[in-house]
Amino acid sequence: MENSKQVKSTEDLSFELSKPFDKSEIKWRPQRQTKDGTSALVLAYVDVRTVQDRLNTVMGIDGWQCKHISYGAKTICHLGLKFNNDWVWRSDGAGDTNFEADKGAISDSLKRAAVHFGVGRHLYDLPSVFVKIQKDQRGQIKINQDDCWQAVRRKQSDIS
């Protein structure tokens, strides 16, 4: 049986890698709270599985690989993508996170390395915004995702 896999150009792959994520794939996390604890500055992010799905979809499961190396409290991800049978490598790192430190550093370093190939770069164009927050019984911050998007639209309309 003949291999029917169509080879895409580097430009086509780069375009597909850098496509914005669907709004439903983007989440918001608090960066810092106001002194009175009623609002928080929130930042847009995607889960590492969303990045892995993009790499699998665009590059194929055999078209990318990553290696993680720890340097003290920092983790460096070396991410390789196969373009026209040649591996192209980019690296970036992250420190331990407040929640599941090692896992967070591994995930964050992969996401940061993927940005070098355009994956998720558009997230840096979204403004950080303040939104009202709620806290659950354990004191965990709860953020309404719709409130975040409304605040982004307001801020972007103020800028233009």
Where are these regions (language model features)?
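Accessory terminal regions of nucleic-acid processing enzymes
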Residues: S160
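N-terminal, Lys/Arg- and Ser/Thr-rich interaction peptides
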Residues: M1-L41
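Positively charged, aromatic-enriched nucleic acid-contacting surfaces
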Residues: L41, V46-S157
